Amino acid sequence: MDLPIQDSHDSSTSPKGKQPTTAEKSATKKEDKVPVKKQKTRTVFSSTQLCVLNDRFQRQKYLSLQQMQELSNILNLSYKQVKTWFQNQRMKSKRWQKNNWLKNSNGVTQGCLVNPTGNLPMWSNQTWNNSTWSNQTQNIQSWSNHSWNTQTWCTQSWNNQAWNSPFYNCGEESLQSCMQFQPNSPASDLQAALEAAGEGLNVIQQTTRYFNTPQTMDLFLNYSMNMQPEDV
């Protein structure tokens, strides 16, 4: 009789399941060995302790070992607690100073740059400069106009005075007196009148030549330039 053949179970289809590999075993061991981080306990300071610590930090930011021990004994704190508090305060102070420095530097940079409207910054008072310059220009122009008008007026008045002077009138009167002689006047009287008229004309010509010289005109112009507005 033939014996029945028993089927051999394949390892892949066996009901026992897969065996874990060495890599998986090592990974599970590492996960088991990961330590759990302990949360640091924060020290809660009382108001009195904070007041003393802040006052000491304002006066002295770095304490020696002996000073920290003395302060910790006074406040009933540990040396480590006092040291940690001072370290944290120094970091906060540096961060605060850095932020203020950045704000101040940004404000100065924005003040130096031109704003979007196209106007200049406030510290550059362009309007004041323009108004001052225009006022100075107007004063110069008004003074120059006043000087020129003074020269013109004085020259015209002087010319009028020169031509209307008694010498000129004297010559005219002499000529008019000559013209008014009657035909029956003696020859001696006519000759005397002509001589008098000639002397008057000579005086007028000499006076006109004197006032027409460059030295006299320069002297007169300098005098008119130095005259104050009140003198005109």
UniProtKB/Swiss-Prot annotation:
Which purpose does this protein serve, as stated in its record? Probable transcriptional regulator.
- Does the entry feature the keyword Repeat, yes or no? yes
PROSITE patterns for this protein: HOMEOBOX_1, HOMEOBOX_2
Question: Which InterPro entries does this one have?
Answer: Distal-less_Homeobox_TF, HD, Homeobox_CS, Homeodomain-like_sf
Question: Where in this protein does the record put region Sufficient for strong transactivation activity?
Answer: 168-232
**Polar residues bias (residue ranges):** 11-25
Protein name from the UniProt record? Putative homeobox protein NANOG2
Comp. bias intervals (Basic and acidic residues): 26-35
A GO term, aspect molecular function: RNA polymerase II cis-regulatory region sequence-specific DNA binding
Question: What is one term from the GO cellular component aspect held by the record?
Answer: nucleus
Coiled coil located at which positions? none
Q: Where is it mostly found?
A: nucleus
Gene3D superfamilies the UniProt entry points to: Homeodomain-like (1.10.10.60)
SMART domains documented for this protein: HOX
Q: Where in the cell is it found?
A: Nucleus
Instruction: Name its species.
Output: Homo sapiens
Q: Where is this region: Disordered?
A: 1-39
**Which GO terms fall under biological process for this protein?**
cell differentiation; regulation of transcription by RNA polymerase II; stem cell population maintenance
Q: Which Pfam families match?
A: Homeodomain
User: What family name appears in the similarity comment?
Assistant: Belongs to the Nanog homeobox family.
